[in-house]
Curated annotation (Swiss-Prot):
This is Sulfur carrier protein TusA. It comes from Shewanella piezotolerans (strain WP3 / JCM 13877). The gene is tusA. The active site is at residue 19. The keyword Chloroplast does not apply. The keyword Cytoplasm applies. It is found in: Cytoplasm. One of its GO terms (biological process) is tRNA wobble position uridine thiolation. Belongs to the sulfur carrier protein TusA family. NCBIfam families: PRK00299.1. Sulfur carrier protein which probably makes part of a sulfur-relay system. Keywords: Cytoplasm. Pfam families: TusA. GO terms for molecular function: sulfur carrier activity. Gene3D superfamilies: TusA-like domain.
Amino acid sequence: MSDQFSNAQHQLDALGLRCPEPVMMVRKSVRRMDDGETLLIIADDPATTRDIPSFCEFMDHTLIASQTDATPYQYLIRKGL
């Protein structure tokens, strides 16, 4: 895991969950965070490669990094822009 991912302030394990559960859990987790805090999401649902970037764009959060070459996928988001 790169330093970028290991420095996340919060982590969400969405392994084994299928659409729409991962994004619902991300939304719930982000709601409890302060603006500027980061969340590492670990998932294996291929739909997250589309859903998490779309969620960030729609909800005005920043997708800092993603690793989707192999499972488990990793996404690092920051609450707010």
